[in-house]
Swiss-Prot record:
The keyword Zinc-finger applies. It comes from Schizosaccharomyces pombe (strain 972 / ATCC 24843) (Fission yeast). Keywords: Metal-binding, Zinc, Zinc-finger. This is Uncharacterized protein C17C9.11c. Coiled coil: none annotated.
Length: 240
């Protein structure tokens, strides 16, 4: 049986060859024919094989060039993506460093302001204490009366200073200032309770002073404040 492709007039020796031809060319119009398939001479077969080889070679070269172009295109896309990613990473890192720098500057400014306030409070305390001493000395001089003693008699006079009956403490926390006065016999634990009530926080478990640097923990919380070296007044920073 010989089949003829009505679309390209090619003669095919079997149904299988027609199916193969249809797969390669998408031709689907065939009919039986009485024409005979002309047998090729050895030279024609050789030329046909050589032509097929050339076509296969050309096809392979085209595929290689297309693959190379595709590879170049993919590389450019990847390189561009990597450059954009690296640029985005650098931008994010720069922004993070800028935020850290701003935080450091803000913290330094807050520390300087806090130190300024503490120094000012210490200076006010010094002036207040000096004024209290001056007032007490003036009162003693005004109320002291001379005592006459007989001749040749031993005489002595003493002047005692009345210790403070209360302590005045300036509490500094989170930008807030709270002044609290408690009796000399009251304890740091009672002071901590007042800090919690007035500043709306939990009772602190430790107090520190900046000038001079000292800390007072729970081991001294039950001692009267007049037995501690922060009495009669101090600037305290609560801690938890």
């Amino acid at each position: 049986m010989v089949l003829k492709c009505l679309e390209c007039d090619k003669l095919l020796s079997s149904i299988e060859m027609a199916e193969f031809h249809s797969t390669k060319t998408s031709h689907d119009q065939f009919e039986e024919t009485e024409e005979e398939i002309k047998k090729r001479s050895p030279e024609e077969l050789k030329q046909a094989i050589e032509a097929l080889r050339e076509k296969a070679k050309e096809k392979k070269e085209k595929e290689r060039i297309l693959a190379l172009e595709e590879k170049k295109t993919n590389y450019k896309i990847l390189q561009k993506s990597n450059d954009e990613t690296a640029q985005a990473m650098r931008k994010m890192q720069d922004q993070a460093r800028l935020r850290d720098l701003q935080k450091i500057r803000q913290q330094k400014a807050e520390d300087a302001e806090q130190r300024k306030k503490i120094l000012a409070e210490i200076e006010r305390d010094k002036k207040r204490r000096a004024a209290e001493r001056e007032n007490k000395n003036s009162s003693v001089k005004e109320t002291a009366a001379p005592i006459k003693q007989p001749k040749n008699a031993n005489s002595s006079s003493t002047c005692t200073r009345t210790p403070p009956t209360s302590g005045r403490f300036s509490i500094r926390h989170d930008g807030q200032v709270c002044n609290i006065t408690i009796a000399a016999e009251e304890t740091l634990r009672q002071l901590a309770q007042q800090v919690a009530e007035k500043m709306n926080v939990s009772p602190p478990t430790k107090f520190t002073t900046t000038f001079p640097r000292a800390s007072y923990g729970t081991d001294v919380f039950d001692k009267p404040v007049n037995q501690l070296d922060l009495f009669p007044s101090a600037v305290l920073i609560p801690q938890w």
